[in-house]
Amino acid sequence: GEDFSIKFYAGEAYEFHVLDNDGNKNHLSDKGMGSLQAMVLILKVASLIKINKKEKKALTLLVEEPELNLHPALQSKLTDFFHEVNKEYGFNFIVETHSEYMIRKTQLIALEQDYIKNQDINPNPFKIVYFHKEEGPYEMEFTEQGKFNKDFGPGFYDEAGSLTLKMIKELRKNQAQ
């Protein structure tokens, strides 16, 4: 959406509307569960920013699977949000995610902001830890090309490629018949 409005009722309830690109006003609940969850997260962070303006404490927020029910593009934008809040307000986030889009976005931001080559001047705010079933957790360090120095376990990054290869094999099999 382009904008939003909140209408309060005697401090007990509220209506939350989202103004879409066409100028239509929609209830947030009609936008889907993912949008609702993302907006609640954003409003909570905004509240903490307001509260923290006076205290100026270093805050670390734990966020569990914020990508649930979100369109891939919004998952990516959520990573932008975490990055901007970190940059502007110094909040740190520990995010548990299974989202390839969010992880890939950290790689892109790290390259765009030159976090990888100039660690002394411009430290990388992103740290990726992969929890491997057999090997246990390990850090996925960024290389200068924006890739990771280690692989994720099977079924994470390679799943899309694996399915594509299976489709190609199936198409070739069907064409041979």
Regions picked out by a protein language model, each given a short descriptive name:
Residues 7-165:
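Switch/communication elements of ASCE P-loop NTPase nucleotide-binding domains
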Residues 172-177:
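Conserved helicase/translocase motor-coupling segment
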Residues 1-7:
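ABC-family P-loop ATPase nucleotide-binding domains
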